[in-house]
Amino acid sequence: MPQKVRIALDAMGGDVGAAVVIPGAAIALSRHPDAEFLLFGDSAKIVPELDQHPRLKAVSRVIHTDVAVSMEDKPSQALRRGRKTSSMWLALEAVKKGEADVAVSAGNTGALVAMARFCLRMLEGIDRPALAAIWPTRRAKCVVLDLGATIGGDAHHLVALAAMGGALASVLFEKPRPTVGLLNIGVEEIKGHQEIREAGEMLRSMNLPQLDYIGFVEGDGIGKGEADVIVTEGFSGNIALKAAEGAVRQMMDLLRSAIKASWLAQIGYLLARGAFRVLREKIDPKNYNGSVVLGLNGIVVKSHGGSDAEGFARAVDVGYEMARFDLLTKINQTLNRDGGALAPAPVAQEAVS
Amino acid sequence: MPQKVRIALDAMGGDVGAAVVIPGAAIALSRHPDAEFLLFGDSAKIVPELDQHPRLKAVSRVIHTDVAVSMEDKPSQALRRGRKTSSMWLALEAVKKGEADVAVSAGNTGALVAMARFCLRMLEGIDRPALAAIWPTRRAKCVVLDLGATIGGDAHHLVALAAMGGALASVLFEKPRPTVGLLNIGVEEIKGHQEIREAGEMLRSMNLPQLDYIGFVEGDGIGKGEADVIVTEGFSGNIALKAAEGAVRQMMDLLRSAIKASWLAQIGYLLARGAFRVLREKIDPKNYNGSVVLGLNGIVVKSHGGSDAEGFARAVDVGYEMARFDLLTKINQTLNRDGGALAPAPVAQEAVS
């Protein structure tokens, strides 16, 4: 990787587009002065924004295209209309051509995953992409995947997710051997689905040097911080993330209306507002923006479509770190080197009788 | 149903047993003076508790047994050791024999579901039991099922869950035609699993008089109150519930430690503590205790194993209401009467050309 981190941005992605992406990039640049940007999209919209951020302008190149994938496009429509021409595709292609180290888009998730898969192709041994997000816990943070890039999957898929999530966590949290748990339920006698039990057995017998498999984790174990990486197929991962987000939002609403209902509570709130700010800071989805699309020959980060400039900057931060600390190499090592996750299981030595 | 509501209690169930169950029953009796109780378990433990609650004692009968299912017993162990003899089994059997209108147990979930299935048998047309819980939402409350009585399931299973959940919601919320949504994710082009889409089509074409099918609901739609009933198979239902519970607990922890860190915030908290009490009241799991085991020839309510007397009383309240308002008849109507959920789909009339 060259000295600079070269970041390709889909400047048209998200609910707002350039008016969020460009100021967001400017914020990220202030935190990472060694970043450079390729900005793909409608130059008539990008350039006026860029003119307001001269430092960003100095390290950016604008590549014009009229075509943008809309937030409503289905993946197949996006591919049909936007392949080779859209700002989303061109940002991904820059990574493919080696002109950028990472692509960041706030465009629609389904389209981005489909295009990334089509443009960058899957890593050797990986069948399907996955979306990984950073989740706040009581103890610190954890990585949860897959959040819905695809749904379902056998034990090998779960093991691949564990390996990729482990590599991501080792980069993000600077842990050489992050703990990994499989999301499961504790009610049934024989716990959970067959494929989860199988994946657990595989991970245990592999005993990978790059990750520490700790067993099953239930839904409430995510927030408790029971593991650095929580692995599950995309359906339940998506449900878990959204149910938790919904519960938090609902609680904030309830608290707000309870406080509004009493003037004493309002005074109390004013006095305690420092504490509330700490809380909001810790749980604000904006601070956890930036899901990583894993499993590809290239690094792609998905920003929330509705995020503001500060939120988008966080997604750029994630992309920067993934590129700077060479996520792809780490993933490949975990998957393939020294009896990695995709190597055949070691044969037990026969005991001498 | 006779004038009185007769409630069979597994007095040994839960982490504590009689010392929670008996005071809990006393609290529930104060709210429902027309209840009567059958108390199954070790009379040496039950009677001393009962002596402290003379009003409860006056409407209770103690049926002694030495055998209790432990919280650690696997379902198969519980059945082997506790069938026909344990306090859990005897409470269920009282319902089967028509001596009680409902059974309530805080015993272990897997054992209770297995025993209930074995003792009471499934309703006609229902293959598997389901666990339904009441969930607080921004707007009011909703019913979520299945929370893990079994995992997986085809479209017919989901339709049966919708019908049973609808009947439960109509009793709980006094709505003649509660809204029902299928839990799903919104990322993939063709949303979610095949069986969910199929179930959606079936529910739409059935257009049942007892429930209003509104389509798919995402994970964050549960807390928003998008439907009175949220239907999903047991794995994702369990994950959703626990992830949301975990997020709420985590948030309360964060808030608590943020407030503790500043004396100004502590004063603010004192002033606002009425508002916090309102919040706690609204989200306290204790106030939502009591999951209903659905699909059986009889009403069974599961209390959380770790709940206190007030929590257990809530579970008894749920059981009381289910019996008083004749949940079973409502379920059977929704399932079978007038082209109910289990009737064959109506054949479209041919248009006269």
Swiss-Prot record, chains A, B:
UniProt subcellular location: Cytoplasm
Identify the Pfam families for this entry: FA_synthesis
State which Enzyme Commission number(s) the record gives: 2.3.1.274
Q: Report the catalytic activity.
A: a fatty acyl-[ACP] + phosphate = an acyl phosphate + holo-[ACP]
What's any one GO cellular component for it?
cytoplasm
- The domain of life for this entry's organism is Bacteria
**Main location per UniProt?**
cytoplasm
Record-linked InterPro entries:
FA_synthesis, Phospholipid_synth_PlsX-like
This entry's Gene Ontology molecular function terms read: phosphate:acyl-[acyl carrier protein] acyltransferase activity
Does the keyword section mention Lipid biosynthesis?
Answer: yes
Keyword field contains Cytoplasm: yes
Q: In which pathway does it act?
A: Lipid metabolism; phospholipid metabolism
One Gene Ontology term of the biological-process aspect is: phospholipid biosynthetic process
Q: What does this protein do?
A: Catalyzes the reversible formation of acyl-phosphate (acyl-PO(4)) from acyl-[acyl-carrier-protein] (acyl-ACP). This enzyme utilizes acyl-ACP as fatty acyl donor, but not acyl-CoA.
The family this protein is said to belong to? Belongs to the PlsX family.
- NCBIfam families of this UniProt entry? plsX
Q: How does it assemble?
A: Homodimer. Probably interacts with PlsY.
Q: What is this protein called?
A: Phosphate acyltransferase
To which species is this protein native?
Bradyrhizobium sp. (strain BTAi1 / ATCC BAA-1182)
